[in-house]
Amino acid sequence: MSARGPAIGIDLGTTYSCVGVFQHGKVEIIANDQGNRTTPSYVAFTDTERLIGDAAKNQVAMNPTNTIFDAKRLIGRKFEDATVQSDMKHWPFRVVSEGGKPKVQVEYKGETKTFFPEEISSMVLTKMKEIAEAYLGGKVHSAVITVPAYFNDSQRQATKDAGTITGLNVLRIINEPTAAAIAYGLDKKGCAGGEKNVLIFDLGGGTFDVSILTIEDGIFEVKSTAGDTHLGGEDFDNRMVSHLAEEFKRKHKKDIGPNKRAVRRLRTACERAKRTLSSSTQASIEIDSLYEGVDFYTSITRARFEELNADLFRGTLEPVEKALRDAKLDKGQIQEIVLVGGSTRIPKIQKLLQDFFNGKELNKSINPDEAVAYGAAVQAAILIGDKSENVQDLLLLDVTPLSLGIETAGGVMTPLIKRNTTIPTKQTQTFTTYSDNQSSVLVQVYEGERAMTKDNNLLGKFDLTGIPPAPRGVPQIEVTFDIDANGILNVTAADKSTGKENKITITNDKGRLSKDDIDRMVQEAERYKSEDEANRDRVAAKNALESYTYNIKQTVEDEKLRGKISEQDKNKILDKCQEVINWLDRNQMAEKDEYEHKQKELERVCNPIISKLYQGGPGGGSGGGGSGASGGPTIEEVD
C-alpha cells in the first residue's frame, strides 16, 4: 500500500454507484450504512438538510422537484445538446442554462440554489468516499473512477473534475467495460495462455454498453465498443409503469398521469416487481391509497413483463453485432461473454444473448452490479503501486471511443487518430496552406465517424498565426494529436519554417470548469459537508437530550423507588422533565448548544436528587449523551 493509505475504485453509475478497495490480496466491495453494496446516485435537498444515496431516493416521492438523479446524463454536455433537451422532458427537477452549461435548480433551506452536474456527481462521489472511509477506518485520498466507453473527452474531463471537487486525487478515468474485464481477468488468471476474445455485455440502470476486448498474458486491449446511452433498467420500469397505469385507469376510471407522486410510487413498486421477476415467474404489486384514496393491488407475470419489453430486449443484440463488425470478428471467435449491470439478471436477456451465440455459456461468476467497481479497485491498487502478485502482471490498454481529426479544405474530416486506437497515443501529420500568402491557419478539432465535419462534434479550435508569405502548398504545418492515459487530448500545430507553434487542450470549449470554478466548488463541497455534519451533531444532541429526559422520567416513576424518593423531589424532576419535553416539541430545529444547554439545566436539577437516591455516589457527573439504558445514563455512571 502507498504511504497515503489504500486507493479505491468507484463505479459512478447513472442510477446506482458502487465502491471497492483492493487490500490483503483481494477486492472488497464495500456496503453502505444501510447494508447495501450499491448506493443510488441520488442527491436530495430539503428545507433542513441535504441527503445523498438511499436517504435521497427514499424520499423522492415526497420531494420530486428537489431530488436530483441522472447527473451522469448531464455531465460534460452543453445545455443545447439534443439529448439534454430530450432528457429534460422526463425529469421532475428543473434544469437551467448558465453560460450554455446545464445546471439543476433546487430549493434548499428556503433558498433557490443551482448546481453544475459536476457538483451533483461530486456529492455522490463524496458519499462513496465516506462509505469507504467508514469501512477502512481512515481517510481515502486517491481513486480510479469509471465512465461509459463512449463518453467523449469533455464528459471524461468533467467526471475527473467531479472527483477533484470531492477532494480525491483521480488516478485515472477508465472505461467501465475495461474495468469489468480487469475484474474478469483477475478471476480467470492462471488459465492456460493464448489470446482470448471477450465480449462484455453491460446493461445497467440507464445505459447499455457492449465492448470486445482481447486478453493475452495479462494485457487487456479494447477492440471495439458499441451501445445505447438510453437503454437500461429504467426503460423496462417505464414500460411496466405505463402498462399498470393503464390498468388502474381501466379498473378505477382514474388517470394517475398528472400526479407525480402517484407515478413515482408506482415506479418504485415496478422496480421492485422487476427484480422479483428475475427469480420468480410472478410478482404482486400492492400500493395503498395510490391515487384519490384508491388502493392498487395487482400482479404481473414474467411473460407479460417480457412481452412489454420485447422490442427493447431484442434491440440489445444490434450493438452486439456492431461491436463484432468493428472488431472484425465473427461471433464464433468470441471465447468468453461477460455479463455486467443489474439488468443482465433478466432471464430473457440472458436467453437472447445465449441463443445469439449458439448456446454458449455466459459468465455470471462476478456479481453484475459489482464487476465494474471491482475492476476499478484493482486498477487503483496497480496505480498506487500495490505489489500483490495478483495484480503484478496486469497491464491496461484503453481506446479512443471516436475518431479524432481536423477539418481540411471543403469541410472534410481528416482523422489523425482512428476510433478504437489504443491510448495513450500520439499521431503527427503535415498539412499546408490553401491559398497564396496565407498568414494563418485555423485548426478545428473534431470527433466522430462521418466524412464531413458538419456531421461530427467540434471539440475546439485555435489559430496558428505568423506564417511567412509563400505560395499555397509550400508552408509545412505539423499537427500533432496527443492523448494521455485518461483520454484527454492535446493538439499542437507548428510551422516547420519558423518553429512557431500553438496548442489547445481539448476541454475549455466544451464547457470545462475553470480552475477557479473547481476551487470554488471544492470549498462549497466542504461547506455542505460541514453543514451536513453540523446537522448530524445537532440531531445527535437533540436525541441525547430526549433520551436523557425520558430515562430520568422513567427512573423516578419506577415503582421500585417508591419510598426512596420524596414526593417533592419526584415532582421537581417530573416538572422539569415535562418542561424540557414541551420545549423539545416546540424546538425541533434548535442548535446543538441549545440542546446541550437544556440537558445541563436538567442535569443540575436531577443529579443532586439522583445521587442522594444512590447514597455515597459522587453527585454530579454529566448524564452523558443518553445511552438509552433503561435506568438512565446518570445512574449508570454513579453506580
Swiss-Prot record:
Modified residues (N6,N6,N6-trimethyllysine): K564
Residues with the Phosphoserine modification: S403
GO biological process: chaperone cofactor-dependent protein refolding; male meiosis I; male meiotic nuclear division; negative regulation of inclusion body assembly; positive regulation of G2/M transition of mitotic cell cycle; protein refolding; response to cold; response to heat
Main location: cytoplasm
Cellular localization per UniProt: Cytoplasm, Cytoskeleton, Spindle
Bias type Gly residues, positions: 616-631
GO cellular component entries: blood microparticle; CatSper complex; cell surface; cytoplasm; cytosol; extracellular exosome; male germ cell nucleus; meiotic spindle
Annotated positions binding ATP: 13-16, 72, 205-207, 271-278, 342-345
Region ranges (Substrate-binding domain (SBD)): 397-512
Domain of life: Eukaryota
Region entry Nucleotide-binding domain (NBD), spans: 2-389
Effect seen on changing K564A: Abolishes methylation by METTL21A
Record keyword Protein biosynthesis present: no
TM spans (from-to): none
One Pfam family per UniProt: HSP70
UniProt key word Nuclease: no
Region (Disordered): 613-639
Quaternary structure and interacting proteins, as annotated: Interacts with FKBP6. Interacts with ZNF541. Component of the CatSper complex. Interacts with RABL2/RABL2A; binds preferentially to GTP-bound RABL2. Interacts with SHCBP1L; this interaction may promote the recruitment of HSPA2 to the spindle.
Cited PANTHER family: HEAT SHOCK PROTEIN 70KDA (PTHR19375)
Matching NCBIfam families: PRK00290.1 (NF001413)
Family, as annotated: Belongs to the heat shock protein 70 family.
Free-text domain note: The N-terminal nucleotide binding domain (NBD) (also known as the ATPase domain) is responsible for binding and hydrolyzing ATP. The C-terminal substrate-binding domain (SBD) (also known as peptide-binding domain) binds to the client/substrate proteins. The two domains are allosterically coupled so that, when ATP is bound to the NBD, the SBD binds relatively weakly to clients. When ADP is bound in the NBD, a conformational change enhances the affinity of the SBD for client proteins.
Function summary: Molecular chaperone implicated in a wide variety of cellular processes, including protection of the proteome from stress, folding and transport of newly synthesized polypeptides, activation of proteolysis of misfolded proteins and the formation and dissociation of protein complexes. Plays a pivotal role in the protein quality control system, ensuring the correct folding of proteins, the re-folding of misfolded proteins and controlling the targeting of proteins for subsequent degradation. This is achieved through cycles of ATP binding, ATP hydrolysis and ADP release, mediated by co-chaperones.
UniProt protein name: Heat shock-related 70 kDa protein 2
Species of provenance: Homo sapiens (Human)
